[in-house]
Structure formats: structure tokens, C-alpha cells
Amino acid sequence: LAEQAERYEEMVEYMEKNLLSVAYKIISSIEQKEESRQAFDEAIAELDTLGEESYKDSTLIMQLLR
């Protein structure tokens, strides 16, 4: 019975570590998405400052990124 309790505690500890790892990955993913959205929005705001050829190239790249 003591061995089972010890294995149970080890299993709980392992599951807690996995849960923390998953939570970290989710939070990192959300932060990366927000940073990407902000960079994209900033790039859109800068389009008006570009010449015609650069504007065409930039809009094509941004369409591909979207």
C-alpha cells in the first residue's frame, strides 16, 4: 500500500509538470499571436508612406502572411 501511495504521488507530480508545460505553451502561443497581429497592423499603417512599387510588393507579402 505504501508503494502504491508513493507511485500515486509521483504520478501526480508528473501530471502537474505536464500541466504547467501545456499552460506555458498556450500562454506563449497567445503572446506570439498578439505580437504578430500588432506587427501586421503597424505594417498596414506604414503602407501609405511607400512608393508605388514598394507598396505593391509589400501588399503582396502581407496578403501571403495573412
From Swiss-Prot:
Superkingdom to which the source organism belongs: Eukaryota
Coiled-coil region: none
Entries under Gene3D superfamilies matching the protein: 14-3-3 domain
SUPFAM superfamilies: 14-3-3 protein
InterPro entries the UniProt entry points to: 14-3-3 (IPR000308), 14-3-3_dom_sf (IPR036815), 14-3-3_domain (IPR023410)
Family: Belongs to the 14-3-3 family.
Protein name: 14-3-3-like protein 2
Source organism: Pseudotsuga menziesii (Douglas-fir)
Taxonomy of the source species: Eukaryota, Viridiplantae, Streptophyta, Embryophyta, Tracheophyta
